[in-house]
Amino acid sequence: PLSLQLNAEANSAAFIAIAEALGKIAGGLHASNAAAELVENAVNSISNMERNDSIGTHAFAKAAFWLHNGGWEDTRFINKLAALFPEQSTINKRMIAFAMGRYRGPWYTDTLQVNRFLNSLQQEPDTLCIVAAMPVAGRTESALAAEYISKQLSNSDSNTELLVSACRASGKNAGVSAQKIEPLLQHKHLSVVLEACAALSGKQLNSEEINRVKQSMNSLPVAAQAAVVRMLHGQGDTLDVKVWISKIDQNLQPYERLACIRALGATGKSAAICFEQALKNPDILQANAYTEAFIEAHNQKDLEFSDTYASALIALMDRGDIGITALCAAEIRSANLTNEEKTNCNEVLNKHLNNLSLPKEVETANEIIKTINAIGKESRDEIKVAFNHPIDWEFVKSIPRKQRAQILTSKGIIEIELHVEEAPGSVASFIQLCKEGFYDGKSFHRVVPNFVIQGGCPRGDGMGGTDYTLRSEFRLHDYRTGSVGLASSGPDTESCQWFITHIPTPHLEGRYTIFAHVTEGMDIVDQIQIGDTIQRIVMLDQ
C-alpha cells in the first residue's frame, strides 16, 4: 500500500508522487464521503511523513493541496503549511500558497495564526506566491487581511494577475471598502475591470458611489458595462429594460452583444422579452444568451412566467439546440415544479435525449440524464464515451519530437511546443485539424482571468465539437503557466477545444490532457479577451 511505501521511498521524485497520490486519494474519497478509514490512514501517513528537507516539504504541500481541494478542514495541515512558509524556496512557497488557498475550514477564525501568516506574506516578493495565497486574505475577518488586500488594490501599476486576485479577495472580505475597489473600474485591462465589478457586487455602495459608477459607465468597454449592470442590480439600482435593449441593438461585436444580452436578465421586468428572443432569434448564440437571461430574470422574481415556467422551458428545449437544451435541463433540476410539471418535463427530456448525436453531444446528454435522475423515478448512469477514434500511428511517427506551432490571433502570435510523445493522439488530432483550416476564424469564447483562455469551438460557445472524441492522455506534467490542454466534459470526451493557462493550475492535473506548452507569446495570452479570434495555426519547420 502507498501509505506503507511513503517513508521507505528513497527516490525524491517517487516520494513526491506517492505523497501527492495519497493526497488525491484521500481528498477525493473525503469529498464523496467514502471510505473514512482509508482516508484516515492516508491522512496519518502524510502527517507522519519523516522526510523534513525541501523535498519533504514539497511533497507535504502537494498532498495537502489535494486534501484541501477535497474539502478537508482539519487544521493540522494548514497550521504546518503556514509555519513552513517563511523559510522555503520560491517553488516550495508557491506550492504551500496553492495548498493554503484551497483550504476552507475553521482555521480562518484563528486571528493569531492568520496574522502570523499574513505578516510572512507581506515580506514575499514573488507575485505568484501572493496570487496563490490571496484567497487566505479574502476568507478571514482579520483587520490585517483587509489592510493587506487594500494595499494591493491601491497599486494600479501592479501586474494584472495580482490585481485580479486582490479584487476577488476584496469581494469576500467585508473589511475592504468599496472606495478601495472603485478606482479599478477605470483600469486599462478589461480583466481587472470585470473583477472589480464582481467585487463591488458584494459591497453596499452609497448613493454617491452608485451615481459615480453610473456616470462613468459609458466610458467603459461594452463587456464592462454589462458587468456594471449586474453590479448595480445587486445594489437595488436596476436600469430600465428599454434603455438596455437599445444598447443591444447598437453596432456591437458579436461577443459584446452576447454580454449585453446576458445582463438583460438583471435589468428588471425582462423575462417576456428574453423568452421571445430565446424562442425565435435565428442567431443560435444569441438565443442561448437570451435563454440564460430568461432564466435569470425568472429567478430574480420576475413573475411573468410564475405559472407557466415549466411549459416555457419545454418550449425552449423544443428548439432542438443542444446548448439551450442543456441550460433548460439544468434549470429544471433546481426549479420548484409540481409533480405534473416534472412528468411533462421528463417526457420531453427523454425525447431530446434520444435525438442527440453521440459522442459529439455527450455533454448535453449527460446534463439531461442528471435531470431525469433528479426529477423522476429513474436512475440512469451517465454515458461513458466508447473508444471511437484510433490513433494514426504512421502519422504520429512523422511528427518531429519538439514540433512547434504558431497560433496567429487577432492580438498577436503565440508559439507552442507540442508534446507528441506524451499525448500522441491529442497532438495528431490537433495538427490534422490545423492543416484542414478547422481553427481558422474561430473565437476565444471563454476567458477566466488568472485561469485560462479557451477557444476552438465550432459553435463559439463551448458546446461544439468534432464528430469524434479522443482518449484522455494524462501524464505527469504539471499544469504551469502557459500549459496547453484539451477541454473535456469527462474522461475520453476531448475533441477540438483547447485552453492555455494564465498561471499554474494544479487542480487540473490528472483531469485534463496537456498536449503542449507556450514557448513565446505569454504576453499575448494575457491580452486575449472573449471574442478575440484565432486567424490560423501553422506548423513550423524544424
Task: Report residues per predicted region.
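Structural detector for internal amphipathic alpha-helices that build alpha-solenoid repeat scaffolds
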Residues: 1-4, 13-33, 53-73, 91-108, ...
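Amphipathic alpha-helical scaffolding segments comprising HEAT/armadillo-like alpha-solenoid repeats
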Residues: 1-7, 28-50, 72-86, 106-122, ...
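Cyclophilin-like peptidyl-prolyl cis-trans isomerases
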Residues: 273, 277, 281-285, 292, ...
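Short, mixed-charge aromatic SLiMs
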Residues: 8, 48, 87-91, 123-127, ...
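A charged, solvent-exposed segment within the mature domains of Sec-exported extracytoplasmic proteins
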Residues: 22, 26, 38, 50, ...
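Short, contiguous clusters of charged residues that form electrostatic/catalytic patches at enzyme active sites
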Residues: 98, 179, 428
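Single, functionally critical "micro-switch" positions that shape active/binding sites
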Residues: 88, 125, 158, 188, ...
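Residue-level recognition of short, well-ordered coil/turn positions
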Residues: 10, 89, 125-126, 157, ...
